[in-house]
Regions:
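Conserved beta-strand hairpin/beta-sheet module of binuclear metal-dependent hydrolase folds
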Residues: 1-40, 99-111
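Conserved beta-strand termini and adjacent loop/short-helix elements that scaffold enzyme active sites
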Residues: 6, 71-74, 88-90, 151
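Active-site HxH/HxHxD metal-binding segment of metal-dependent hydrolases
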Residues: 12, 24, 29-86
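A short linear hydrophobic-aromatic micro-motif
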Residues: 4-5, 86-87, 146
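Mid-domain alpha/beta scaffold segments of enzyme catalytic cores
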Residues: 8-10, 19, 27-41, 65, ...
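Metallo-beta-lactamase
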Residues: 24, 94-169
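Histidine-centered catalytic micro-motifs
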Residues: 48-58, 88-97, 149-155
Length: 169
């Protein structure tokens, strides 16, 4: 799987385009539709997944409306064409936060739940310290060598972040 990161909008949100064969999944199209569409090119968009509904993660979503069907993901395993992943509900930053885990590839897309050397804010509407602690405990059970792609900033490993968020749980 090829992973392209596109930094979009005033809040420097990471949007990801995952490509297998000529198909792709777009994660968090926060803004700058043209930049995202340029990266998508002539690939077939099979899904657009939002890690949580804050404006900086959904700003370009309406531009894709003709290409998608609204669907609320629940915890569990999903297979869309050749893409296989798990959705893990990880509230804390916001009640609707999800983490997208590709087990075979050992990668996670965490939105604003986990960042490199930090975790998401809990003082915004929908944030919860107790939910964040539960979500961090849940994610801490996953393998250390998983690469974490967050909603802002640089990539990291789950091992590095476990060392950081152990202070919160």
């Amino acid at each position: 799987m090829k992973i392209d990161k596109i930094i979009v909008g005033d809040h420097q949100t990471n949007c990801y385009v995952l490509t297998l064969n000529n198909n792709c999944i777009v994660i968090d199209p926060g803004d700058d539709y043209e930049k995202i569409q340029e990266k998508v090119g002539n690939k077939n968009i099979k899904a657009i997944i939002i890690t949580h509904y804050h404006f900086d993660h959904v700003g370009a979503l309406n531009n894709f409306k003709s290409k998608i069907i609204d669907y609320k993901y629940k915890d569990g395993f999903y297979k869309i064409n050749d893409f296989e992943f798990n959705i893990i509900h990880t509230p804390g930053h916001k009640e609707d936060c999800i983490t997208i885990y590709f087990e075979k590839e050992k990668i996670m897309f965490t939105g604003d739940f986990i960042f490199k050397n930090s975790i998401g804010r809990m003082d915004l509407e929908g944030g919860s310290i107790s939910d964040m602690k539960k979500s961090l405990k849940l994610i801490s059970k996953y393998d250390d060598d998983i690469i974490v792609y967050s909603g802002h900033g640089n990539d990291t490993t789950l091992k590095n972040e476990k060392n950081n968020f152990k202070y919160y749980i």
